[in-house]
Amino acid sequence: MKNTNSYCNKGETMVNFTRKPRYGYEDLLEIIRLLRSPEGCPWDKVQTHASIRRGLLEEAYEAAEAIDLDNAGLLQEELGDVMMQVVFHADIEKDRGRFTMDDVVDGVVKKLLYRHPHVFGSAHEDSPESVLISWDQLKRAEKGQATTGEAMEAVARSLPGLWRAEKLQKKAADAGFDWPDISGALSKLEEEVRELRQAVETGRGVEEELGDVLFAAVKVGRFAGIDPEEAVAGTCEKFIHRFRAVEDGAREQGRTLEEMTRLWNRAK
């Protein structure tokens, strides 16, 4: 006899789910199906792609943080949360009759086979760099992107702005549209900063000019081999550290918040 315990939806009905020492992929599919069933969880069964979109992003970022921390236990947990999100979205589509989780897996396996002809075919690539070039060429052919502009249009607009800027710049550079070295990128950044200053003084076009400054800064980072998001993340951590030093100093010296700027400069 199966050992079953129950999930309760509203205290009115019980949904049986087999308890066992270890679960697998099929169990995840089944528990998501049960949670979204008419007898399942009141919250889960009313969710849509849009309502849990943020959850997917947050779980991906939490997995990324686990990688940064090199915490295997945390990474295992967070990858599970990401996988749960993927299965949840696929189950919504299964109910709509548009695709299933099997279709998702089938599609990604076929994509990997197609984009690795040097492994599963007769093509030859002898370096990671040549593999990336081949991957991009195959991706563009697969998606029917005949021009660099079409490839740029396909870069996800939901990406963090700095990463999107970096990807767009790389595609332009691959097409031959770029500064020859970092000096040109630095000069452009200085030019954009001057234009931002003028915009602030006139009160017109500040948002556009600020965007230009950030875009130019990303290009400098690209020439220097620096990930712009990681650079900003590091600055955020530095800001927290310095702010706490200022805050602690102000408290110890009985100073007011108005005096924190002077302490801040001392902390730098």
Residue ranges and their predicted role:
Residues K2-E78, M84-L210, L214-K268:
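Flexible "arm" and connector segments at domain edges
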